[in-house]
Protein backbone atom coordinates (compact mmCIF):
# COMPACT_ATOMS: atom_id res chain seq x y z
CA UNK A 1 0.00 0.00 0.00
CA UNK A 2 1.04 3.55 -0.66
CA UNK A 3 -0.34 5.15 2.49
CA UNK A 4 1.46 8.31 3.68
CA UNK A 5 4.20 8.10 1.05
CA UNK A 6 4.63 11.58 -0.35
CA UNK A 7 6.65 12.77 -3.31
CA UNK A 8 7.04 11.70 -6.91
CA UNK A 9 9.56 9.12 -8.12
CA UNK A 10 9.85 10.61 -11.64
CA UNK A 11 11.37 7.33 -12.92
CA UNK A 12 14.66 8.01 -11.13
CA UNK A 13 16.66 6.52 -8.30
CA UNK A 14 16.68 8.42 -5.02
CA UNK A 15 20.24 9.67 -5.57
CA UNK A 16 19.40 10.86 -9.10
CA UNK A 17 16.28 12.65 -7.81
CA UNK A 18 18.23 14.33 -5.02
CA UNK A 19 20.96 15.52 -7.40
CA UNK A 20 18.42 16.70 -10.00
CA UNK A 21 16.41 18.79 -7.52
CA UNK A 22 19.60 20.17 -5.97
CA UNK A 23 20.72 21.34 -9.43
CA UNK A 24 17.26 22.68 -10.29
CA UNK A 25 17.09 24.66 -7.04
CA UNK A 26 20.51 26.20 -7.71
CA UNK A 27 19.43 27.15 -11.25
CA UNK A 28 16.19 28.62 -9.94
CA UNK A 29 17.95 30.77 -7.33
CA UNK A 30 20.58 31.86 -9.87
CA UNK A 31 18.23 32.82 -12.72
CA UNK A 32 14.98 33.30 -10.73
CA UNK A 33 13.05 31.69 -13.63
CA UNK A 34 13.42 28.20 -15.11
CA UNK A 35 11.39 26.07 -17.51
CA UNK A 36 10.79 22.41 -16.71
CA UNK A 37 8.09 19.76 -16.82
CA UNK A 38 5.03 20.29 -14.64
CA UNK A 39 5.59 17.32 -12.26
CA UNK A 40 9.22 18.38 -11.70
CA UNK A 41 8.08 21.97 -11.09
CA UNK A 42 5.55 20.88 -8.47
CA UNK A 43 8.12 18.70 -6.74
CA UNK A 44 10.75 21.47 -6.87
CA UNK A 45 8.57 23.54 -4.54
CA UNK A 46 9.24 20.99 -1.78
CA UNK A 47 12.99 21.60 -2.14
CA UNK A 48 13.25 25.33 -2.87
CA UNK A 49 10.69 26.89 -0.53
CA UNK A 50 12.21 25.48 2.69
CA UNK A 51 15.60 26.87 1.61
CA UNK A 52 14.15 30.37 1.31
CA UNK A 53 12.48 29.99 4.72
CA UNK A 54 15.85 28.89 6.12
CA UNK A 55 17.50 31.97 4.60
CA UNK A 56 15.20 34.33 6.50
CA UNK A 57 17.20 33.69 9.69
CA UNK A 58 20.89 34.33 9.06
CA UNK A 59 23.17 32.17 11.19
CA UNK A 60 26.25 30.05 10.63
CA UNK A 61 24.24 26.87 11.24
CA UNK A 62 21.60 27.87 8.68
CA UNK A 63 24.25 28.80 6.13
CA UNK A 64 25.86 25.38 6.59
CA UNK A 65 22.50 23.64 6.14
CA UNK A 66 21.86 25.65 2.97
CA UNK A 67 25.34 24.83 1.63
CA UNK A 68 24.74 21.15 2.37
CA UNK A 69 21.56 21.27 0.28
CA UNK A 70 22.91 23.38 -2.62
CA UNK A 71 26.71 22.84 -2.66
CA UNK A 72 27.23 26.37 -4.00
CA UNK A 73 28.80 29.19 -1.99
CA UNK A 74 27.52 31.81 -4.43
CA UNK A 75 23.92 30.62 -4.11
CA UNK A 76 24.16 30.48 -0.31
CA UNK A 77 25.34 34.09 -0.38
CA UNK A 78 22.46 35.12 -2.64
CA UNK A 79 19.96 33.21 -0.50
CA UNK A 80 20.94 34.89 2.75
CA UNK A 81 21.92 38.35 1.48
CA UNK A 82 19.18 38.88 -1.11
CA UNK A 83 16.34 36.36 -1.09
CA UNK A 84 16.04 35.99 2.69
CA UNK A 85 15.63 39.75 3.07
CA UNK A 86 13.31 40.01 0.05
CA UNK A 87 10.87 37.49 1.53
CA UNK A 88 11.28 38.46 5.21
CA UNK A 89 7.62 39.45 5.58
CA UNK A 90 6.14 36.74 3.33
CA UNK A 91 4.90 33.63 5.15
CA UNK A 92 5.51 31.16 2.32
CA UNK A 93 4.49 30.76 -1.29
CA UNK A 94 7.76 32.08 -2.68
CA UNK A 95 7.44 30.29 -6.04
CA UNK A 96 4.98 30.70 -8.89
CA UNK A 97 4.30 27.86 -11.33
CA UNK A 98 2.90 28.90 -14.72
CA UNK A 99 1.86 26.28 -17.25
CA UNK A 100 3.32 27.00 -20.68
CA UNK A 101 2.05 24.38 -23.08
CA UNK A 102 3.52 21.05 -24.12
CA UNK A 103 6.99 19.96 -25.16
CA UNK A 104 7.40 19.29 -28.88
CA UNK A 105 8.70 15.71 -28.87
CA UNK A 106 6.88 13.81 -26.20
CA UNK A 107 4.00 16.24 -25.50
CA UNK A 108 5.02 16.54 -21.85
CA UNK A 109 3.27 19.38 -19.98
CA UNK A 110 5.77 22.19 -19.39
CA UNK A 111 5.82 24.96 -16.80
CA UNK A 112 7.79 28.03 -15.79
CA UNK A 113 8.90 28.19 -12.16
CA UNK A 114 9.73 31.68 -10.96
CA UNK A 115 10.35 33.50 -7.72
CA UNK A 116 7.32 35.60 -6.85
CA UNK A 117 8.79 39.09 -6.40
CA UNK A 118 11.57 38.89 -8.97
CA UNK A 119 12.62 41.97 -10.93
CA UNK A 120 11.24 41.75 -14.46
CA UNK A 121 13.53 43.20 -17.13
CA UNK A 122 15.57 45.43 -14.83
CA UNK A 123 15.17 49.08 -13.90
CA UNK A 124 12.89 51.44 -15.79
CA UNK A 125 14.72 54.07 -17.82
CA UNK A 126 13.27 57.58 -17.71
CA UNK A 127 12.71 59.27 -21.07
CA UNK A 128 14.53 62.58 -21.48
Curated annotation (Swiss-Prot):
The entry's keywords: Ribonucleoprotein, Ribosomal protein
Cystine pairings recorded for this chain: none
Coiled coil: none
Family, per entry: Belongs to the bacterial ribosomal protein bL17 family.
InterPro entries according to UniProt: Ribosomal_bL17 (IPR000456), Ribosomal_bL17_CS (IPR047859), Ribosomal_bL17_sf (IPR036373)
UniProt xrefs under PANTHER family: LARGE RIBOSOMAL SUBUNIT PROTEIN BL17M, RIBOSOMAL PROTEIN L17
Protein known as: Large ribosomal subunit protein bL17
Molecular function per GO: structural constituent of ribosome
Record-level GO BP terms: translation
Cited Gene3D superfamilies: Ribosomal protein L17
Subunit description: Part of the 50S ribosomal subunit. Contacts protein L32.
Gene that encodes it: rplQ
Keyword Ribosomal protein applies: yes
GO cellular component: cytosolic large ribosomal subunit
Amino acid sequence: MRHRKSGRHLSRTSSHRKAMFQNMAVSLFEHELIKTTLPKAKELRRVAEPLITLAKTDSVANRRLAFDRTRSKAIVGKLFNDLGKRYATREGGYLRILKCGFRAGDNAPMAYVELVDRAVGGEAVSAE
